[in-house]
């Protein structure tokens, strides 16, 4: 299971500039608040591995994938668990 406090630190440093401080989305960057931790983790894993089939199934994988993929590439399994735990607390 992920550590939401550690996830918040990582989110604030790496995700908030595009997705917003409360994950409400900004412009072309999607809202993450309200998603389950499972969906967030699945999506992060897909971005990291380049799994375009899963991204398309999730309604993702458009032009913004070029921005998201390198961000996900550096995440460890624990980072993804922590981010998923934190983002799932946001409504």
Curated annotation (Swiss-Prot):
The keyword Heme applies. Disulfide bonds: none annotated. Heme c binds at residues 15, 18-19, 64. GO terms for molecular function: electron transfer activity; heme binding; metal ion binding. PROSITE patterns: CYTC (PS51007). Coiled coil: none annotated. Transmembrane segments: none annotated. The keyword Metal-binding applies. Binds 1 heme c group covalently per subunit. It comes from the Bacteria. Keywords: Electron transport, Heme, Iron, Metal-binding, Transport. It holds the Pfam family Cytochrom_C. InterPro entries: Cyt_c-like_dom, Cyt_c-like_dom_sf, Cytochrome_c_Oxidase_Subunit. Monomer. This is Cytochrome c-554(547). It comes from Halothiobacillus neapolitanus. The lineage of its organism: Bacteria, Pseudomonadati, Pseudomonadota, Gammaproteobacteria, Chromatiales.
